[in-house]
Amino acid sequence: MTLQSDRADAADAAGVEVRIRGVLQGADPDAVWAVGGPDGPHAGSADGTPPLDVGALMPVLALWPVIGSLVAEEALRLHTPLTAYGVEAAAGTTAHHLLSHSTGPAAHTSLTRLAEHLTGSPLAELAAARVWHPLGMTGTGFADGTLHAPPADLARFLGYLLSPAEHPLTRAWITESLRIRTGELTPARGLLWHPAPYGTWSYGETPTVWLSPRLPRWAFLLPTHPPGPLRTTFREAAFAPTPSL
């Protein structure tokens, strides 16, 4: 017998899909997108899309989980200065500072150099061995100087982050990353992730991924052109409460 809560969840998922398709129909009908939960995708653009250029998501798909795995192994402490590990950095710079207060290529380069120094392996190999292969992200990898991944692999990654599984990333790392780490400073940040309305966390501008541990729900949007206001309207459609009838 179908429980009332199951019917409500199904109705909510259907409502989210209708809202998203309505938003994209006029703004970017060819955008690649999906929304789902820890059990997998609930709706999205056409299945079977080949790997896409997701280089802008490299920090969250490769660097952030690799750093998390090093923390779990106690090979890295977030508040220890990078110079203590033999890595060149400004005095007092820590991995925590780079993840929560710094943005852009310089911070990502410093963290990549740290991970590669601690392990003796390039980031591409670390991410594949520690994260992508364990999650079954067989289509994800670096090629032609950038990161490529099919939508199905993005769904696997985001769904895992909302699941109770402890491998390849620990719940502690995910939970600690999705809380404010900047105190009263603005803009507020977690560990790489940015807080957003409706209890969501996001990374990226074009493309963008979102997580809501509370719902639990994830979403991603890979637009065909700079999204402008579409990024906000897509998030609203995916995560704003469904109006009561």
Locations of regions flagged by a protein language model:
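A structural signal for well-ordered alpha-helical segments within the folded catalytic domains
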Residues: 60-65, 93, 109, 151-155
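A short, hydrophobic, proline-anchored segment that marks a local hinge/packing element in signaling
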Residues: 106, 114, 210-211
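Short glycine/serine- and small hydrophobic-enriched flexible loop segments
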Residues: 65-75, 112-117, 156-163
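Residue-level preference for non-acidic, small/hydrophobic
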Residues: 67, 98, 111, 131, ...
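Active-site helix/loop module of the DD-peptidase/beta-lactamase fold
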Residues: 53, 57-58, 70-105, 118-146, ...
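Broad structural signal for hydrophobic residues in well-ordered alpha-helices, predominantly aliphatic
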Residues: 24, 114-115, 131
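Hydrophobic, well-ordered secondary-structure segments
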Residues: 108-112, 124, 128, 151
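Catalytic loop of the DD-peptidase/beta-lactamase superfamily, centered on the K-T-G motif
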Residues: 1-54, 119, 143-245
